[in-house]
From Swiss-Prot:
Belongs to the aldehyde dehydrogenase family. Signal peptide: none annotated. Pfam families: Aldedh (PF00171). The active site is at residues 262, 296. It comes from the Bacteria. PROSITE patterns: ALDEHYDE_DEHYDR_CYS (PS00070), ALDEHYDE_DEHYDR_GLU (PS00687). Involved in an alpha-terpineol oxidation system. This is Probable aldehyde dehydrogenase. Its EC number is 1.2.1.3.
């Protein structure tokens, strides 16, 4: 079978070979491992074979976790802030000590190449270290011999953190763990497809923090509503699709819970006329196709200046032809499969729509995949601005290539998206100041990326609200308290 035939073949989601006795993971509630009566298989997307069994939490488990978190909060909030930071730093040490094991498990359950899995673990470690070193701001308004007034920050209480399948480990640790958390590791669509690594981390950190400070749950579609609708939850931090985010927001509104939503994006990169270089081509390529394009802040629309369009496109295609697509655990593979059958079907439907209307598809890459959810790197050459692959977030290895003439025009087209995550610009920084801050997005990058844990990020418009990471992300998990003391 040719690589092209292999790339175009749709895997049958019903044809799954069951391995002998895959290991079962357990929930973490109140510092203890908890088994369940029901389990779902965790599939390796490169082979579609089980690598383990995911426990399915019941409503009773949710109540147990909520009670454990509430009891822990009463004690944990009294621990000095500096001591809490030290314990968070200790989590980074645990991740470092088990990095190889966790990276291999992450590759097997998520699909990304092993080097990228190690990078995700390194990111989680950096987030722990960063959050464990951030000072909580305290503002003194008035201080005299007779009067003191100040504003301090205190932890909110029990938090539900909902983690997605594309970066389940790093995003889990973006959500500051120094606050008491009822941590849920399950997507409201299919929690079993990404729970293994974080369930394993839950097992590793049970003795690192007081019982109940972090509880790790996984399950099916029922788990999300049970957690987000619970009256004793003070805050929800959700990372996932805009569609599910709206459901979470409605659930939070019933009790006026604090809410952070990090949702989908249809991010654009802009390549100016002075950027026809191999370095820019490589940078733009990986901004779109890292993790097979399954990143909220990945480039999903590429605007290229008309004067270099054909030359830049051809360089991009030539670079893509050398990318090896296959099982991320194998040497030499630099791009893995789609993570699950649902996402595979979504991207295939967008590609099929281009074919049906007679659009030009350019398929690239060296396919070494088997029965997994593999797709070739696919460019759409000059689609209409209203085409589905331009308007919708593909969240896969599909990238529309578009022309533009001037900066004002392209900024208007970038801003036409309903989402507002990121705008990236492949231009020389010294010549890009004009217009750089005009995109209606929460982040703008110019020939660089978000490469430090201290930076905060988030969305606007349909990409959500609130902040993750950095000081701004930390403050999302706190509430202000103004203290006024009249001294005698």
């Amino acid at each position: 079978m040719s690589s092209r035939e292999s790339a175009s073949r749709r895997p049958d989601p019903l044809r799954v070979t069951i391995m002998q006795s895959p290991s079962a993971f357990s929930l973490t509630i109140g510092g203890h491992g908890v088994a369940t009566s029901d389990y779902l298989p965790v599939l390796n997307p490169a082979t579609r074979q089980p690598i383990g069994q995911c426990p399915v939490a019941s409503e009773e488990h949710v109540e147990q976790a909520r009670a454990a978190a509430g009891d822990a909060f009463a004690v944990w909030r009294q621990v000095p802030y500096g001591k809490r930071c030290e314990q968070l730093q200790a989590l980074a040490g645990i991740l470092e000590a088990h990095l190889d094991e966790l990276a291999q498990l992450l590759t097997h359950e998520q699909g990304k190449p092993l080097a990228d899995a190690r990078g995700e673990l390194a990111g989680a470690i950096a987030f722990c270290q960063c959050a464990g070193s951030l000072p909580l701001p305290e503002v003194v308004h008035e201080q005299s011999a007779t009067r003191l007034s100040k504003t301090v920050r205190e932890p909110l209480g029990v938090v539900v953190a909902i983690v997605p399948w594309n970066y389940p480990v790093s995003i889990a640790f973006v959500k500051p763990d120094r606050r008491v958390g009822c941590r849920k590791h399950a997507d409201s669509q299919a929690g079993a497809d990404h729970a293994a690594d974080y369930l394993r981390i839950g097992e590793l950190i049970r003795d690192a923090l007081p019982a109940g400070v972090i509880n790790v749950l996984a399950g099916n579609d029922d788990l999300g509503p049970w957690l987000t609708g619970h009256a004793d939850v003070a805050k929800i931090s959700f990372t996932g699709s805009s569609v599910t985010g709206r459901h979470v927001a409605r659930s939070a509104a019933a009790d006026l819970k604090r809410l952070t939503l990090e949702l989908g994006g249809n991010d654009a990169a802009v390549v100016m006329a002075d950027s026809l270089s191999d370095a820019v081509v490589e940078r733009v390529f990986w901004s779109a196709f890292t993790n097979a394009g399954q990143i909220c802040m990945a480039t999903k629309r590429l605007y290229i200046h008309e004067s270099i369009y054909e030359a830049f496109r051809d360089k991009l295609v030539a670079y893509a032809q050398n990318v090896v697509i296959g099982d991320g655990s194998q040497p030499g593979v630099t791009m893995g499969p789609l993570q699950n059958a649902k996402q595979f079907a979504k991207v295939m439907s967008l590609i099929d729509a281009v074919r049906q209307r007679g659009g030009r598809l350019i398929e690239c890459g060296q396919m070494r995949g088997g029965d997994g959810y593999f797709l070739p790197i696919t460019f759409v050459d000059l689609p209409d601005e209203s085409a589905p692959e331009v308007v919708e977030e593909a969240f896969g290895p599909l990238l529309p290539l578009l022309k533009f003439r001037d900066v004002d025009e392209v900024i208007e087209r970038v801003n036409a998206a309903r989402t507002g995550w990121l705008a990236a610009s492949g231009v020389v920084i010294g010549r890009s100041a004009h217009g750089l801050q005009q995109p209606s997005t929460r982040s703008v990058w110019s020939t660089t990326g978000c490469d430090h844990a201290v930076y905060s990020f988030g969305g606007m418009k349909a990409s959500g609200y609130g902040a993750e990471s950095g000081l701004e992300g930390l403050l999302e998990f706190t509430t202000q308290k103004t203290v006024i003391i009249q001294q005698q």
